[in-house]
């Protein structure tokens, strides 16, 4: 129960420090806070910040690195004070609320040469909320299939049905075909399957809805996908994966318990450092009509609307977003890069990364936009994970779960129309 006190203390410290953000010598002091904190990541950010300070000797940057579990809460509390913060990490699920509260500055792009070097995806996500650049993404999270090449797979599965069949063949004794995610975040995987099974009828811009305005949960294809989701758990996955979250499903693969895993590119580094040596990657499986859908996770750097040094804050955001720095950050964190120049870098076009390039070049591997700006989004994240647990343990049926989700998102559509 001490977290709120720590957060308030952090905010108070920044408020007090913010009173002296300049100096008589003309030196400008910026305060910057990260969200997805880890020791190696913080070390890399400090290196990039040191390069910025070297190039701008009149600007000094203080980096605040809160613990990962409470970072977003602390950032929000600091933003509420509207003092003592200049640059911050903004995530895909915080940018909407931060901008709605007026905490984020609109970043200039027309006079910044680095804008034209950003990939089309980076430019699109920078202005995804309200059509205004409240952040510059530093990289993207997109799922791919990791699989063991020494477990009898001649070729990686290209459809969910093939994944199920391959997983059954791999499952024997204490080895299982698939790293299932039944715990927190598990509902996202069944939604991904349902999306693939709905195929071309799905509206990628509003990915919980079809082009005819019905929800993706209302169709016979949704029933097929959900039933297969349950079969993949029961027949190809470890029984305790009913409660697995991100760490457990990754560990299941790297420890040799499972032969397949679907996860983000940050796992590449984890697998490379593990004892697993015979593995590869492939684009995520498709549905019966040949389509695969997934959202792209992202985060980036933004400037506060109340910064006492807006020009310098923007300068730091732009520096971190330019090719050299952004590519270094993407490499250090196993992210899909934002710079066009990275496309010629061997790290992002060979080996485990090749699957991401293949997916980007496949018109039927479609990027979607989740309804994160709908009022019920946060509640659905909680409710849907609970429903998946009930589904996997036999407390709810496929029909009951889909009926509930269909009703929820039908109602949500009325609230935003």
Language-model regions: role of each:
Residues 35, 227-312:
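Extracytoplasmic/periplasmic substrate-binding proteins
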Residues 44, 171-173, 317-340:
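Periplasmic-binding protein-like
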Residues 92-144, 155-158, 162-164, 189, ...:
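Hinge/lid segment of periplasmic solute-binding proteins
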Residues 109-119, 199-224, 272-274, 286-294, ...:
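Short, solvent-exposed loop/beta-turn-alpha elements that line the ligand-binding surface or hinge
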Residues 121-127, 282, 331-383, 390, ...:
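Long, aromatic- and glycine/proline-rich binding clefts that accommodate carbohydrate-like moieties
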Residues 167, 211-242:
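Glycine-centered hinge/linker elements that transmit conformational signals in sensory
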